[in-house]
Regions:
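Positively charged n-region of N-terminal signal peptides that target proteins for export
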Residues: 1-4
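Bacterial N-terminal signal peptides
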Residues: 7-16
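Residues within well-ordered alpha-helical secondary structure of globular protein domains
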Residues: 12, 65, 92-95, 133
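Short, helix-capping/interhelical loops that line the mouth of catalytic, cofactor-
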Residues: 23-47, 95-158, 189-205
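N-terminal targeting signals for Sec/Tat export/insertion, comprising classic cleavable signal peptides
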Residues: 33-73
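Short, contiguous alpha-helical
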Residues: 49, 53, 57-60, 72-115, ...
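Solvent-exposed, charged/polar functional surfaces in cytosolic regulatory/catalytic domains
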Residues: 54, 58-61, 65, 137-144, ...
Length: 205
């Protein structure tokens, strides 16, 4: 009988402690800011912009890491015929960002982005500014993407025919594609990519 009483008391104590624990957890969760409880994008534009800005930051990092006297660097020792030099890669990505989001807005995109377009930027500071301007523009336009216009048709020679949502995704992919290429340009010049340095990765990027 004593054993049963002790067991019953232990069970009651356990239930009481569990209730107290749950109450404490509930109080802690309700005291947290709303952003910490549900820190996810609240719109279609936000769902893409975080990844776009991350890709842009990575690309800008490699563009800034390469010394200006290496902006004319072209890989050798393999099948690199007719590839762009480092500076041309940066200019191409900047031009493409303007092109994609010009098409998003129904505007005429710049011509010849394959070669960097007609923007006169040539020096490293000029190309970095051109790149930053293109990123600022793309984020400004992306902010207008909504559930109502996401599937609107977009025409254009760069990413059309497509939808506004689709062309936004293409813009993210395009930056990451060229980021991967420029990582090799940096490493061929003995430079560790900034993102690798930041996270101290031992292999890969």
């Amino acid at each position: 009988m004593k054993i049963l009483c002790i067991a019953a008391l232990l069970i009651l104590c356990g239930v009481a402690l569990t209730a107290v624990g749950k109450s404490k957890t509930l109080q802690e969760s309700t005291s947290k800011p709303a952003a910490q409880q549900d820190d996810i994008p609240r719109s279609i534009a936000d769902s893409i912009s975080g990844t776009l800005q991350f890709a842009e930051g990575n690309f800008l990092g490699v563009a800034e890491a390469m010394p200006e006297n290496k902006y004319s660097f072209v890989p050798t020792g393999g099948k690199f015929d007719d590839v762009r030099n480092f500076g041309e890669q940066v200019k191409h990505v900047a031009c493409a960002q303007f092109a994609f989001f010009n098409e998003f807005e129904g505007k005429k995109p710049p011509e010849d982005c394959e070669k960097g377009g007609h923007e006169p930027a040539k020096t490293k500071p000029e190309l970095i500014k051109y790149l930053k301007d293109s990123f600022n523009y793309s984020n400004h336009v992306l902010a207008t993407l909504t559930a109502n216009n996401a599937l609107e048709r977009v025409e254009g020679r760069y990413a059309g025919p497509n939808t506004k949502l689709g062309i936004s995704v293409v813009a993210v992919w395009h930056i990451t594609d060229h980021y991967g290429q420029l990582v090799e340009y940096l490493r061929m010049n003995g430079i560790v990519p900034p993102m690798t340095q930041k996270y101290r990765l031992k292999s890969g990027d």
